[in-house]
Amino acid sequence: KFQIAGFLHWGYNFWNSGLSRQRLNPWQVTDGNGAFPGGDPFSVYPGPEGPVQSLRMKVFHHGLQDLRALELAQALTGRDVGPEVLPGYGEMTFAQYPQGAEELLAARERLNALVESASC
């Protein structure tokens, strides 16, 4: 619907306060000392052997997998599969969309079944 070409998350490992005035421990201070929403300035935490993925990064990865599965289903069927995967939601926007874990997991199961049946 929106045909968004990409996504930019500006703060992969910004472990500082606003304007980089001081270095912070992101395990203890997740909002840049009040400069950002909690967890927003970084996607990974520092770890002893390299970066540790944040929950935000893991969920974003799942979202990208969902997008790829939707694109595959559309390519296999030749139609918009959104209404089948998320029935009853009508027009979705960036502000109005399904948010419950159960409904999102059920939607993914419907999508998986659609891809499976279209692949046979």
Regions found by a protein language model. Name each.
Residues K1-L19:
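Catalytic-core regions of glycoside hydrolase
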